């Protein structure tokens, strides 16, 4: 494979020295970019973008062409590709977000679920990864990703997104055996899916545990973290002559950083409710940290964005082990110029912390 021209993202995840703090944005290929909206219109809909490797490659590269400061590309896809490949029938309702034609509500439903083969059932994702990796030609590393078992389970049991997860939590407490079987099947599926992405060319992987923070402390350990640990222990950690770093991101997981840091990943993602300096003091000896600016800061003026970037960099302090990111995905209404101001500020203001 082509040598990497910019590997500071991978170096920071492994806490190796860097010249400036690397930066990327969750959902950096997204609706805030006019070029993305044009590609989506051309493709017809969101799933057509995801399922066509050429379109997925095109939109993955758009933010990199616009912002030379980006230190990583992330595969353009959706976390719900796995449940879709299990036969749940993913579709998108305008204004409603993702929905499933089938829901999982009984032990029999769960027992009937297949474990998808990443190459046969999710081949379009593997094709997208290899296409993007080829087109990147070593510019920056490519991040692969998946949803966590708990997060995927919530969509499968609720039939879509939910405010209170009442069906999923009822299953968890009424029928823990069924929930554990579902999570175990999902953990196996995620492990093979991420390993498929690594073999296809992903140079780091992130597990998005978007809804883990909605669990009680005890339930989080048993029904979310335990299954992410299982995945991490089964991942390919070296490929193509390089280590493949793993990032775990539990939104609203700041109370549990110590136990997440024991899961075996290289880095933890932080949402904006955490103080990154405090997080470093607690777990920085074990893992790198990624984050964690409030995405809505991007609605403020560029000077205010720059001030907030400076505050977060100062809070983390000197040395490597920090990948700058937002605390969640960039939102569709953000002005692309403000995103550019954010990215420039990270590189300009962080050099002093790496001397």
From Swiss-Prot:
The enzyme's E.C. designation: 4.1.1.37
Positions bound to substrate: 27-31, 78, 155, 210, 328
Reaction(s) catalysed (UniProt annotation): uroporphyrinogen III + 4 H(+) = coproporphyrinogen III + 4 CO2
GO MF term list: uroporphyrinogen decarboxylase activity
Chief location: cytoplasm
Location of this chain's protein in the cell: Cytoplasm
A Gene Ontology biological process term: protoporphyrinogen IX biosynthetic process from glutamate
GO CC field: cytosol
Site (Transition state stabilizer): 78
Alphabetically ordered keywords of this record: Cytoplasm, Decarboxylase, Lyase, Porphyrin biosynthesis
Parts of the chain that traverse the membrane: none
Top EC category: lyase
Family, per entry: Belongs to the uroporphyrinogen decarboxylase family.
Listed HAMAP family: URO_D
Name the UniProt record assigns to this protein: Uroporphyrinogen decarboxylase
Protein source organism: Pseudomonas fluorescens (strain Pf0-1)
């Amino acid at each position: 494979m082509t040598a990497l021209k910019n590997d500071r993202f991978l170096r920071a995840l492994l806490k190796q020295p860097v010249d400036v703090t690397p930066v990327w944005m969750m959902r950096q290929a997204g609706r805030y970019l006019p070029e993305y909206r044009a590609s989506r219109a051309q493709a017809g809909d969101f799933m057509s973008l995801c399922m066509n490797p050429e379109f997925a490659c095109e939109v993955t590269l758009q933010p990199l062409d616009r912002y030379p400061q980006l230190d990583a590309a992330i595969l353009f896809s959706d976390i719900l590709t796995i449940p879709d490949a299990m036969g749940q029938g993913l579709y998108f309702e305008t204004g409603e977000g993702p929905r499933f034609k089938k829901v999982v509500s009984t032990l029999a439903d769960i027992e009937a679920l297949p474990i998808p083969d990443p190459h046969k059932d999710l081949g379009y994702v593997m094709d997208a990864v290899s296409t993007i990796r080829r087109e990147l030609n070593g510019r920056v590393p490519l991040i692969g990703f998946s949803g966590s078992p708990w997060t995927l389970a919530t969509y499968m049991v609720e039939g879509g997104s939910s405010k209170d997860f009442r069906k999923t939590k009822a299953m968890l407490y009424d029928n823990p055996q069924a929930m554990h079987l579902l999570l175990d099947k999902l953990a196996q599926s995620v492990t093979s899916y991420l390993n498929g992405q690594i073999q296809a060319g992903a140079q780091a992987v992130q597990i998005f545990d978007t809804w883990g923070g909605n669990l009680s402390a005890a339930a989080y350990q048993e029904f979310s973290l335990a299954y992410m640990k299982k995945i991490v222990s089964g991942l390919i950690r070296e490929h193509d002559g390089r280590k493949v770093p793993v990032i775990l991101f539990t939104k609203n997981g700041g109370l549990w950083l110590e136990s997440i840091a024991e899961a075996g990943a290289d880095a933890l993602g932080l949402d904006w409710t955490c103080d990154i300096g405090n997080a470093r003091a607690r777990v920085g000896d074990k893992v790198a940290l990624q984050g964690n600016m409030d995405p809505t800061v991007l609605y403020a003026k560029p000077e205010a964005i720059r001030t907030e970037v400076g505050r977060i960099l100062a809070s983390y302090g000197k040395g490597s082990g920090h990948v700058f990111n937002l605390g969640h995905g960039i939102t569709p209404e953000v002005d692309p110029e403000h995103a550019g101001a954010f990215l420039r500020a990270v590189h300009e203001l962080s050099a002093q912390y790496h001397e």
